[in-house]
């Protein structure tokens, strides 16, 4: 005998379970401003929010923005990150405004690391809500990423 399933359950197809996880991608909601913090950099005048998550064999964590001589290691276009020791540079992220026809009318994102820890960089356009992620697997040295098609202008 086949088990009886109410019509609502069959028609739902368990989408009610999956939808809360998919909703941020289907309906990200209105864009929100970038808010600078220990684990958040705001580049190009706050247009782009940058965050880093790291992973090791024994755990996970959030990258922190470095400081050099008490000054935050963040300019308008770039930021340096540490994972474990505030004096040990792990990686850098740069976002450039290439919004001219000769350069393709795009914002560019560059990611480079000096670690074999796994990491994921998340860059969010606070004007549109668009998100790009760049990842490096645990145990591998990262190749520099140069994404010259990252976000549309303006």
What is the predicted role of each segment?
Residues 28-154:
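Polar/charged low-complexity regulatory segments
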Residues 20-30:
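Phosphate/pyrophosphate-recognition segments in soluble nucleotide-handling domains
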Residues 1:
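C-terminal substrate-binding/active-site "lid" region of AdoMet-derived donor-dependent transferases
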Residues 4-5, 9-22:
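Class I (Rossmann-like) S-adenosyl-L-methionine-dependent methyltransferase catalytic domain
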């Amino acid at each position: 005998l086949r088990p009886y399933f109410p019509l609502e359950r069959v028609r739902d197809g368990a989408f009610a379970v999956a939808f809360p996880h998919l909703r941020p991608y289907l309906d990200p909601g209105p864009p929100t401003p970038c808010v600078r913090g220990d684990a958040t950099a705001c580049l190009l005048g706050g247009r782009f929010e940058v965050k880093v998550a790291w992973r090791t064999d024994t755990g996970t964590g959030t990258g922190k923005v470095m400081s050099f001589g008490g000054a935050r290691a963040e300019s308008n276009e770039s930021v340096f990150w540490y994972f474990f020791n505030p004096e040990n540079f792990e990686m850098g992220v740069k976002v450039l405004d290439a919004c001219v026809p000769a350069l393709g009318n795009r914002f560019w994102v560059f990611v480079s690391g000096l670690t074999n820890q796994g990491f994921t960089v998340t860059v969010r356009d606070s004007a549109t809500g668009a998100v790009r992620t760049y990842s490096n697997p645990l145990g591998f040295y990262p190749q520099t990423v140069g994404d010259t098609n990252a976000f549309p202008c303006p």
